[in-house]
Amino acid sequence: MAILNMQDLELQGKRVLIREDLNVPVKDGVVTSDARLRASLPTIKLALEKGAAVMVMSHLGRPTEGEFNAEFSMQPVVDYLTKALDCPVSLATEYLDGVEVAVGEVVVFENVRFNVGEKKNDEALAKKMAALCDVYVMDAFGTAHRAQASTHGVGLHAPIACAGPLLAGELAALGKALDNPARPMVAIVGGSKVSTKLTVLESLSTKVDQLVVGGGIANTFVAAAGHQVGKSLYEADLIEEAKRLVANAQSRGGDIPVPTDVVVASEFSPTATATLKDVSTVSDTDMIFDIGPDSAEALAEIIKNAGTVVWNGPVGVFEFDQFGEGTKRIAQAIAESNAFSIAGGGDTLAAVDKYGIADKVSYISTGGGAFLEFLEGKELPAVAMLESRGQ
């Protein structure tokens, strides 16, 4: 991939426009989770250290295009950056026709989704953004799967378009995990529905040695193996698909192991009583909410011996502690493993936080949808744009 990297460019005196993913939760005008802001700081600081006049843009939430809405303003982000950066930081509400920004300063643009044409990747809008800078830096992996004016179009028209350190690091880590993985390679794919992760499962089943399924997805595979799943969430219409995926994996010498024991309850609630059962004894009224300790231990052994682990999705309803032991054991196994591990997706990151293993995972992906599309083997529009500009 011939992508220019911001780290390699001379930026002294240059106007640098950085697209970050600063889409953070805000309550009463204050940022409540700053993970994405923290992740963006090294890129912004590097641009300042290189002597640039820095402009930063992002979306926040889902406002109606063409309308200012204070609820989705970037002001709380500006307040945060003012404390985090040792330089002047200001908010530009009107910026498309020009911005005053000096070397050593940071100007944050108001929410890009307030602009009509942002989501449709409007060319006129993209050209206006491109005219503001000498160098455009795409650093938002979380939105790299969307072809929008601030993530794609602007890069086609800017004098120079490059990847920021966060995006470059993300692509390098994903490439290491997927393009040339240390074997055995294990992928853990959780989530509620096979249908939403079908392309991921298909793509990974041709690459990995063991494909571990969890959550509602696993229930469909349990049913495909001929077991009762009671009232559990599963997709009867995808049982044949599940059988095909298992057969494909096994024909390559791999497998998609099905749980041998499960944790069930008769209702979905924080106070539901958890009961451990052999997978062959699930009753008509049971709902499967987690894998049992024997299954968890078997998976932990697979992870322990892995060379590469890709984790996307919990194996149980870990939000309720009585259904969290399976995911906890998986998390511990990843933490203890010598494998190169990469974790991505909102629920996965919540599990990483809950079980305190963030510093034991080799790479934590900032992208949800983009992470999934990369796993599916899809081309990400923003990455394709950077490749074309890097020629």
Swiss-Prot record:
GO terms for biological process: gluconeogenesis; glycolytic process. It catalyses: (2R)-3-phosphoglycerate + ATP = (2R)-3-phospho-glyceroyl phosphate + ADP. SUPFAM superfamilies: Phosphoglycerate kinase (SSF53748). It is an enzyme of class 2 (transferase). The keyword ATP-binding applies. It holds the Pfam family PGK. GO terms for cellular component: cytosol. It comes from the Bacteria. InterPro entries: Phosphoglycerate_kinase, Phosphoglycerate_kinase_CS, Phosphoglycerate_kinase_N, Phosphoglycerate_kinase_sf. This is Phosphoglycerate kinase. It comes from Shewanella halifaxensis (strain HAW-EB4). The gene is pgk.
